Every structure is written in structure tokens, then in C-alpha cells.
């Protein structure tokens, strides 16, 4: 099913985040874009979108292509949920999942697969947005795992 919502033009910022999922787990890697001295584990693919009236599915595919050197999959990002950022007021986040059939289909430096429980039990290790999204991403990861193992 295509997600054809247009990105809102009245928000300060719109961010598209893509969560690679496989075997019921979420792929994360260290990101230091907020604090260089204390990198937090977060989703590896995220972009700020400043365009007005842009299709979020199209933008998510562009973001995935930007990271093609880390991916070995033809899968497309799938819309999951729209929510507001925990850390930046006025920021809307469009969260996508990238379903992978094998954990070998993705490689970022220092990246790894974790469960939503890992994220919940170790809040200081993960970004605030990922902590907010972890339960939903855990359910999405399990759903895609069930789908691929039918």
C-alpha cells in the first residue's frame, strides 16, 4: 500500500527515518550528529526534508538510494508511522521500515541488530527518538519476520 500523504508545510522541520529490520530485530549504529563526545546508537538512515508538498514515499526511496553502498537489497522502505520528535519541538518524523530477508544485506561501520527490549533496558545507549520508536519498531520487525518466514 502506497503512503501518499504530503509532507506538511507548516512544520519547522520534517525528518524521514528508515529502520532496517530483520529476524525480529532493528539495525542501529553509532551516530554522533547531536553530541560528538557521546555518540548514541540510532537508526542509520535519516534525512531532514525541507521541501513543501513532497511525497514521503518518494523521499524515503531517495534516502535509501543515498546509502546504497551499505545495502544489498532491492526492498523498498515501508511507511510505519508519523510522530513528533522527542527532542526537537515542532519536528515531524515519518518513520519507515526497510524489511531485510538476511542480516547480511546491510553493513554500516559498527552497526548491529538489537531487539526493542535491548533499547528499553539501556536508554542511555540509544537516541531519544529511537527510545520512543522502539516498541513500535519491535512489533514491525516481528511482523516482517513472520511475513518472510511463512
Regions found by a protein language model. Give the residues of each.
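Conserved N-terminal beta-strand and adjoining loop/helix that marks the start
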Residues: 2-28, 49
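Positively charged, low-complexity intrinsically disordered regions
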Residues: 4, 62, 108-110
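Active-site-adjacent beta-strand/loop module that shapes the phosphate/pyrophosphate-binding cleft
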Residues: 12-14, 22, 74-75, 81-112, ...
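Conserved Nudix-box catalytic region and its N-terminal flanking loop in Nudix hydrolases
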Residues: 25-70
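Nudix hydrolase/Nudix homology domain
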Residues: 35-41, 106-150
Amino acid at each position: 500500500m502506497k503512503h501518499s500523504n504530503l509532507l506538511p508545510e507548516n512544520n519547522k522541520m520534517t525528518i524521514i527515518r528508515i529502520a532496517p529490520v530483520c529476524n525480529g530485530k532493528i539495525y542501529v549504529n553509532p551516530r554522533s550528529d547531536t553530541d560528538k563526545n557521546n555518540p548514541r546508537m540510532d537508526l542509520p538512515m535519516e534525512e531532514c526534508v525541507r521541501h513543501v508538498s513532497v511525497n514521503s514515499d518518494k523521499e524515503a526511496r531517495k534516502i535509501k538510494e543515498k546509502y546504497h553502498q551499505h545495502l544489498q537489497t532491492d526492498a523498498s522502505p515501508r511507511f510505519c508511522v508519523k510522530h513528533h520528535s522527542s527532542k526537537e519541538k515542532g519536528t515531524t518524523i515519518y518513520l519507515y521500515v526497510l524489511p531485510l530477508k538476511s542480516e547480511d544485506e546491510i553493513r554500516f561501520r559498527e552497526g548491529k541488530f538489537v531487539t526493542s527490549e535491548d533499547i528499553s533496558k539501556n536508554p542511555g545507549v540509544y537516541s531519544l527518538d529511537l527510545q520512543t520508536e522502539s516498541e513500535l519498531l519491535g512489533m514491525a520487525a516481528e511482523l516482517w519476520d513472520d511475513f518472510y518466514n511463512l
